[in-house]
């Protein structure tokens, strides 16, 4: 089999066989097929697309490129959750302890932030001493004993995706539906959970800009999950504005803790209830959505979810005092308000622009090697359709110095659009695909 023949076949619109796809993935993972040939094939896929069968075969070849976790030694139903990424997305920090209180174990491999989106592992490192790197044995033990674990991906879990994603990132081939589907689902299938719930975001701060794109992605992923015998559900949710109010690592942790204390709600709580009810019903821990939502809300009211989160932080070496005293989390020395330039209603917030403000403050990575400042970021005081008077604060900037704070004030002000008419708030949860 020749790589040049496979490239030419896809270039001309042909359908690759499972054997041809396996040849490419196996050879590339072992270092026998060079970057330049895989780059050519990736670009051909971007232009010509892939059939549903090709996408499935690509996903499975990537799964087979490394280890597949066997979670059978952990008791009960095991679930996993994935978000396609957005601004202010601290959902896992709230959702996992809420679900774990109901006896459904959550085994989650997470990543770090890059660009305008934040990473769950970075947020968790706001807790002094927290360890993201667990051995496989330690990961399994914690899921069994604590009910959930969040750790960095093991070195040999889906190595094909690591190589392919790095190559796509530098060759202009990230935006391709079959490549996105296979990247996400190969990782989820290799992670071994019985139930997979996907949060597919759409809008200005999301990877999928339109609801139609998000719907297509969701359907493809759900089908691949089901073909592998996994109970798979996708929720299409709004990312035309940041999720919650806080953007930035320690600030988002503090907001998640406020939710677990029962002191914060809004779109973040609605998302946790939506995703959580899907997990509980698919896992057989609730008879339907109403019962599931009631159980999840009770986990907050009783304090069980907060206590579960403290157990989790303690188990991974973090200082659990910070769970009950968020003032101990990293604090930025400089805070500046962003005044509204006029009176009216918030007509639009550039979610990606908000994420970039946090990144430029030092709260995110421009490159994978960038160091981040866990304390910096921003807290929004006005969101879509909220009323505001001229001079009132739209947001508070949390910065390491006056210069970066003043620059962020100007950048964040530009992300807001204020008009005389109150716009309609679009539905936050657009659809649930099973």
What kind of region is each of these model predictions?
Residues 1-88, 101, 308-315, 319, ...:
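Acidic, glycine/proline-rich low-complexity segments that act as flexible tails and inter-domain linkers
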Residues 5, 10, 15-17, 28, ...:
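Well-ordered secondary-structure scaffolds
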Residues 144-193:
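Phosphate/diphosphate-binding glycine-rich loops and adjacent basic-rich segments that engage nucleotide
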């Amino acid at each position: 089999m020749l790589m040049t023949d496979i490239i030419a076949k896809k270039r001309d619109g042909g359908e690759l066989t499972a054997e041809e796809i396996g040849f490419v993935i196996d050879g590339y993972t072992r270092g026998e097929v060079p970057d330049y040939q895989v780059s050519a094939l990736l670009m051909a896929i971007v232009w010509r697309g892939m059939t549903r069968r090709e996408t499935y075969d690509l996903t499975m070849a990537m799964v087979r490129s490394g280890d597949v976790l066997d979670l059978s030694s952990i008791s009960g139903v095991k679930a996993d959750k994935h978000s396609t990424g957005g601004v202010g997305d601290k959902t896992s920090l709230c959702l996992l302890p809420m679900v774990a209180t109901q006896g459904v174990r959550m085994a989650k491999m997470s990543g770090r932030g890059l660009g305008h989106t934040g990473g769950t592992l970075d947020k968790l490192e706001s807790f002094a001493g927290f360890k993201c790197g667990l051995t496989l044995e330690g990961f399994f033990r914690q899921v069994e004993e604590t009910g959930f674990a969040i750790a960095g991906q093991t070195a040999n879990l889906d190595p094909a995706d690591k190589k392919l994603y790095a190559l796509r990132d530098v060759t202009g081939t990230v935006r391709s539906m079959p490549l996105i589907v296979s990247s996400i689902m190969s990782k989820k299938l290799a992670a071994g959970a019985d139930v997979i719930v996907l949060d597919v975001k759409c809008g200005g701060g999301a990877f999928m800009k339109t609801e139609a794109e998000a719907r297509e992605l969701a359907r493809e992923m759900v089908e691949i999950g089901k073909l592998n015998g996994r109970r798979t559900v996708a929720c299409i949710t709004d990312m035309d504005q940041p999720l919650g109010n806080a953007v930035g690592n320690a600030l988002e942790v503090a907001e998640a803790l406020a939710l677990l204390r029962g002191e914060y709600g809004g779109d973040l709580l609605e998302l946790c209830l939506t995703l959580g009810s899907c997990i509980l019903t698919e896992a057989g821990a609730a008879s339907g959505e109403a019962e599931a939502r009631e159980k999840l809300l009770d986990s907050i009211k009783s304090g069980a979810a907060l206590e579960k989160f403290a157990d989790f932080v303690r188990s991974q070496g973090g200082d659990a005092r910070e769970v009950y005293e968020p003032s101990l989390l990293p604090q930025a020395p400089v805070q500046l308000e962003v005044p509204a330039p006029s009176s009216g209603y918030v007509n639009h917030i550039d979610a990606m622009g908000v994420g970039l403000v946090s990144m430029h403050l030092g709260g995110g990575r421009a490159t994978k090697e960038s160091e981040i400042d866990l304390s910096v970021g921003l807290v929004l005081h006005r969101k879509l359709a909220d009323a505001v008077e001229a001079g009132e604060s739209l947001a508070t900037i949390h910065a390491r110095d006056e210069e970066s704070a003043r620059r962020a004030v100007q950048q964040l002000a530009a992300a807001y659009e204020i008009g005389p008419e109150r716009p309609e708030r679009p539905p936050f949860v657009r659809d649930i695909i099973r």
